Amino acid sequence: GGTRSEVVLASRNGELFVVRRSQREPAALAWELELLDGLADAGFVVPRPVPASDGQLSVEGTWVAAFRPGRHPTAPDEWARVVRLLAELHRFSIGYPQRPGFASSADLLERSAGGDVNLDRMPRAGVAAVRSAWAAVQTGAVSVVHADPGPSNILVGEDGSVALIDWDESRVDVGWFDLAAVPRDVPLPADTPLSRDAIVTAGVAWEAATSWVAEPDYARRRLSQLRSRQA
């Protein structure tokens, strides 16, 4: 589920569905659902929105997708498939428009807010730390990023297919943020121009900033971790 939306499992005529109540603004939610619909059309395994009877993809912030069984990745070869899938996502979505109300890490080097980030609420030293980490990864193409591809948001099917679920935090940014949570024993793409440490540090910085208002205790732990990585 996550901390920024409500998720329940529902059944209709013996078929299981996931019902999500989003807290996003209508334009931001519409962007997410249109993205998912387009990715599903392109062959990505994602939660495709089930339209309501009038054809709308959401009704007052609530939307529905078919339930997909699966387990979270554990083995290195499963994570290697995840890495390939993320790289494919990034290539596919180069040039995609930014999510309404959101900002990329590059934007936030100058701006103070976008999406779940509000740097005005953070201490000045914390803002300097996260911006330093983000500045270090500003290379390569800008594309859609899932933005939270940890194991709980990845499902491996019985057929070996890999599904990315819970796109609530997705935005447009440099793709390296999606690689920050890849286990250390799993290689990153061979053409990655950045060090793994720089990518992980940028990811820690993003988690600190994006959680500062909604999950302050967690955010402070991540900021402490960031400072240790930068020391």
PLM segments and residue spans:
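Helix-rich C-terminal or lid/interface subdomains of diverse kinases
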Residues: 184, 188-231
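ATP-binding glycine-rich phosphate-binding loop
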Residues: 1-12
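A glycine-centered beta->alpha junction motif in the catalytic cores
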Residues: 61-76, 110-117, 205-220
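Catalytic-loop of the protein kinase fold
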Residues: 144-146, 151
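A cross-family kinase active-site recognition segment
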Residues: 73-124, 142
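Active-site Asp-x-Gly
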Residues: 143-144, 156-198
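A conserved alpha-helical element in kinase catalytic cores
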Residues: 20-61, 72-89
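Protein kinase catalytic-loop region centered on the HRD/HxD motif
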Residues: 136-143
